Amino acid sequence: MNGIINVYKEKGFTSFDVCAKLRGILKQKKIGHTGTLDPDAEGVLPVCVGNATKLCDLLTDKDKVYEAVLTLGIITDTEDMTGEVLERRLVTATYDRVLEVVEQFTRTYDQIPPMYSAIKVNGQKLYELARQGKVIERKPRTVTIHAIDILGVTPLEEQPEIVHEVRMRVSCSKGTYIRSLCRDIGEALQCGGCMKSLIRTQVSIFTLENTLRLAEIEECVKNQTLEQVLMPVDKLFLSMPKVVVKKESCKFLYNGNQLVEDNFTWEKVSDQINIDKIRVYDSEDVFTGIYEYDEKKNCYQPVKMFL
């Protein structure tokens, strides 16, 4: 069994929990997720099965899209509403001011990750140190916020012109902590803030609309319809030209050797002008790997094999 399942991670589960449960449901040991979601977050969690686990790092590096709710005026130790409230501040931000500040974060900037995170410092995870009551200096990490769209705001009841909560869609690079983005926006508004809720809506080509909950996957196994929801590995690489290796040259392919153009045929003649990366199939049309053109040696070298 090889492929990728677009799992809807529900609240209360860690990403590790999801993989552990899937091992039981699928009776498959080789399973890995493609980027941690906090236990209280929910949404898209692509899970790789079988030889697709070789893609875990590749998918972790992809851009992501989230929908988050930012609550202004509250500062917590975890940077979300699950933590201990450290401070409450007066909020004076109007919608126009919120819009102005949010737009300033659509850029590349150095973000300080939260103490409650799985980042390791001197071999220890930050959240382990945080639980011991320790707060240590964290190195900023460069992240890119591609876009922030404000989907709606909730005003203060007693002052309707003042914003209490902001619901926003964030498109960002790998390594971005939305909790920390909420913290930073709150600080820029001079009232502080923390994340109330988080849903991941997209990772690469995987979207919220096509996710399956664990119970639904279990049902697919019972009904023997799992193949319908297990995405083939090669679907991630459809933008690359396809080549089929000739039968007599498959021995080179199976051994992970370099290939020259005489070893294969192009699916489309027009694809030959794009000679950067190709997706390679054996003579039986079984997807086998990704190769990259080596200009110095005038051949294609294996990048990732899925044998």
UniProtKB/Swiss-Prot annotation:
GO function terms (MF aspect): RNA binding; tRNA pseudouridine(55) synthase activity
Disulfide bond residue pairs: none
SUPFAM superfamilies per the UniProt record, alphabetical: Pseudouridine synthase (SSF55120)
InterPro entries from the UniProt entry: PsdUridine_synth_cat_dom_sf, PsdUridine_synth_N, tRNA_psdUridine_synth_TruB, TruB_C
Active site positions, chain numbering: 38 (nucleophile)
Family indicated by similarity: Belongs to the pseudouridine synthase TruB family. Type 1 subfamily.
Reported function: Responsible for synthesis of pseudouridine from uracil-55 in the psi GC loop of transfer RNAs.
NCBIfam families: TruB (TIGR00431)
Name of the molecule in the record: tRNA pseudouridine synthase B
Gene name as annotated: truB
